[in-house]
Design a protein with these regions (language model features):
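N-terminal secretory signal peptides
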Residues: 1-9, 17-23
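Gly/Ala-rich beta-loop-alpha elbow adjacent to hydrolase catalytic centers
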Residues: 106, 110, 114
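Flexible "cap/lid" loop of the alpha/beta hydrolase fold
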Residues: 122-123, 127-159, 166, 193
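Short beta-strand/loop motif that positions the catalytic acidic residue
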Residues: 213-215
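Conserved loop-alpha-helix segment in the C-terminal half of the alpha/beta-hydrolase fold
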Residues: 217-241
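Catalytic active-site module of serine/aspartate enzymes centered on a nucleophile-bearing elbow/loop
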Residues: 244-268
Length: 268
């Protein structure tokens, strides 16, 4: 005899409702791209964000409302930091939720993600924020190893199979934010598996896509010299800010200007 719990019933109700909605819309509608109102915004490029370690999509919260108000479709990937390939796939899935062409923006490890995901033909431009940008022979780790380690790595702990940023590490991660905002950053951190930075993936988008790069001159998480190195290597339009590792939170107006320049370069 099979016992049905209230949870089972709720799940059946949810599945039934989803099936009914699909039938009501018709099978072709399920595969449609964004709706007509969304396509009405297609005169401007869409913006897709990819976060890094010890962050989630909310790290772009000071950018998203302004870009939306200016007529861009915007979405933030919420990847789990479980595997490089899985994170890249998560970013690519976001492309189907907006009308291209896409300005793909990556922060920190998110730069590795946009480097690989950005080879998708829907992506027209790349924006790197204090970000990694490995070549085809590099991993995130091997790229970092070419430069002196930064102070933040003295404030991490591996617990329960994840790498956590300790509370006392926030000054080296986001030290130009208020104490209250630093606490918020720590509380919303997404944490990676220990081997994430040693994993590899195909595709180097910055070799074929126009790129912009924001260097954080006071970055104590990704070495600013690494940032300058990869920006020069990709021939990026480069802006240096007197910021920590999180310029999108501490200097959002300047970061918005960079994204706008990238968007204006795209013919829609």
């Amino acid at each position: 005899m099979t016992e049905h719990t209230p949870h089972d019933a709720s799940r059946r109700d949810l599945l039934a409702a989803a099936a009914a909605m699909s039938l009501a819309a018709g099978a072709p509608a399920a595969a449609e791209q964004p709706s007509s109102p969304a396509r009405a915004m297609a005169g401007k490029p869409s913006i897709v964000f990819a976060h890094g370690l010890w962050a989630d999509g909310s790290c772009f919260s000071k950018l998203v409302p302004t870009l939306q108000a200016e007529g861009h479709e915007v979405i933030c990937s919420q990847h789990g930091l479980d595997s490089l390939s899985g994170d890249v796939d998560c970013v690519v899935r976001c492309f189907g939720q907006v009308s291209g062409p896409i300005v793909l923006v990556g922060h920190s490890y998110g730069g590795t993600l946009i480097t690989h995901a950005g080879v998708d033909p829907r992506v027209a431009a790349l924006v790197y924020l204090c970000a990694l940008a490995p070549d085809e022979t590099e991993t995130s780790q091997s790229l970092q190893a070419k430069f002196p380690a930064t102070p933040v790595f003295g404030h991490i702990a591996v617990t329960d199979g994840r790498i956590w940023l300790k509370r006392d590490g926030t000054p080296d991660f986001c030290g130009d934010l208020s104490p209250a905002d630093q606490k918020l950053v720590w509380a919303t951190q997404a944490v990676p598996v220990p081997d994430l930075f040693t994993q590899k993936h195909d595709g180097v988008a910055w070799k074929s896509k126009p790129s912009w790069y924001v260097v954080g001159k006071q970055d104590r998480t990704v070495n600013p010299e690494l940032e300058r190195f990869v920006a020069k290597r990709m021939n990026a339009t480069t802006v240096e800010l007197d910021s920590s590792h999180v310029p999108m939170l501490s200097q959002p107006a300047a970061v918005l200007d960079v994204i706008r320049h990238a968007a204006r370069s795209i013919k829609t």
